[in-house]
Regions:
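Short, active-site-adjacent cap segments at secondary-structure transitions
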Residues: 67-68, 98
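Oxyanion-binding and handling regions
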Residues: 1-40, 88-128
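Short, residue-level hotspots on alpha-helical faces of the histone-fold
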Residues: 40, 44, 79-80
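Phosphate/pyrophosphate-binding loops at sites that engage ATP/ADP/AMP, CoA/4′-phosphopantetheine
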Residues: 42-58
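Short glycine-rich anion-binding loops that position phosphate/pyrophosphate groups of nucleotides
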Residues: 11, 64-65
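DPxDG-like acidic metal-binding loop motif
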Residues: 58-63, 69-87
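Phosphate-handling active-site elements
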Residues: 50-54, 82-94
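Short acidic/glycine-rich loop or secondary-structure boundary segments that cap or lie
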Residues: 14, 68-69
Length: 128
């Protein structure tokens, strides 16, 4: 199972891909120029780790709370990938994980299953 995790809700854009049992991560500044090329950052990240969007089984995206622009852009990309590539996605918030402490990004797929996060449902949490 190959999982992609995207978090653009904070001051960094965080990407993680779990390929079998291997975990690869990177981060970028959360800036307007990076929002405009987020899909390029994702594609380059996957290529660097010898995979592609076609090999991703599930995508997990942080729905907030956090940056409106970051959440909006990451959700738009994930929704587009769902429509064009038929990749299921899960919109999580660290608030969903019921006081689980020290949550690592690689734990997100297991926690989404544990807390029954619904697939292909977008309910963003924006900070005012």
């Amino acid at each position: 199972m190959n999982n992609l995790i995207i978090d653009a809700a904070t001051d960094k854009i965080f990407l993680s891909v779990i390929i079998d049992k291997n975990i690869y991560t990177c981060s970028h500044e959360n800036s307007k120029s990076n929002f405009e090329k987020l899909i390029i950052l994702i594609t380059d990240f996957l290529n660097k780790n010898k995979t592609s969007i076609n090999k991703i089984d599930k995508i997990y995206v942080n729905r907030g709370p956090g940056s409106f622009a970051g959440i909006r852009n990451s959700l738009s990309i994930v929704k587009g990938l769902f429509l064009t590539q038929k990749i299921d996605y899960y919109c999580f918030s660290f608030l969903d994980f019921d006081k689980s402490t020290n949550v690592k990004y690689e734990d997100v797929p297991i926690l989404c299953d544990k807390f029954k996060i619904k697939k292909n449902l977008i309910k963003p949490l924006y900070l005012s």
